[in-house]
């Protein structure tokens, strides 16, 4: 049975206040009970044919642990039925494909495993997630000045330069 390298994406979860999303979308009507919870989708095609996009936006949701192997950190998001949590979150990801692994599926799996293990180490080796603000990531900083947004990840977070976890071409995208 042939095994082929399938495109996938890697990245991070961004958390922000649900009220900020709704203010941006609904302006003066934000918070009106007749309006749905605010959602968004962003995408941008960048160099080398890659795409950076948001995925699985969770209004009023939380960030949860989703690792499938010991010694790895993977995050996912979820919203409960009411979607009434203080924060919203979305995955911000960049596409990777066979050219990143010479078309070798084993190299793709090894790449994913290395990222998950690097996240584990960057989080402190105790299943906390590495974290930084979006502004810091874009500036190449590694700062975690939480301000009004308190992370929902149940194991906690550790300040980290997330750009250093991804290969340069993916982080630069």
What positions do the PLM features span?
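Residues forming the flavin
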Residues: 1-173
């Amino acid at each position: 049975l042939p095994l082929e390298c399938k495109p996938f994406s890697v990245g991070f979860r961004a958390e922000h206040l649900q009220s900020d999303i709704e203010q941006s979308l609904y302006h003066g009507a934000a918070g009106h009970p007749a309006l749905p919870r605010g959602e968004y989708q962003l995408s941008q095609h960048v160099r080398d044919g890659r795409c950076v996009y948001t995925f699985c936006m969770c209004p009023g949701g939380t960030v949860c642990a989703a690792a499938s192997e010991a010694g790895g950190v993977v995050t996912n998001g979820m919203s409960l039925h009411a979607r009434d949590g203080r924060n919203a979150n979305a995955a911000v990801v960049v596409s990777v494909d066979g050219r990143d692994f010479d078309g070798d599926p084993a190299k793709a799996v090894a790449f994913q495993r290395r990222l998950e293990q690097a996240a584990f180490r960057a989080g402190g080796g105790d299943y906390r997630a590495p974290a930084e603000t979006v502004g810091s990531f874009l500036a190449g900083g590694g700062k975690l000045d939480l301000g009004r947004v308190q992370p929902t990840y149940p194991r906690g977070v550790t300040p980290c330069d997330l750009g250093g976890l991804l290969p340069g071409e993916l982080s630069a995208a």
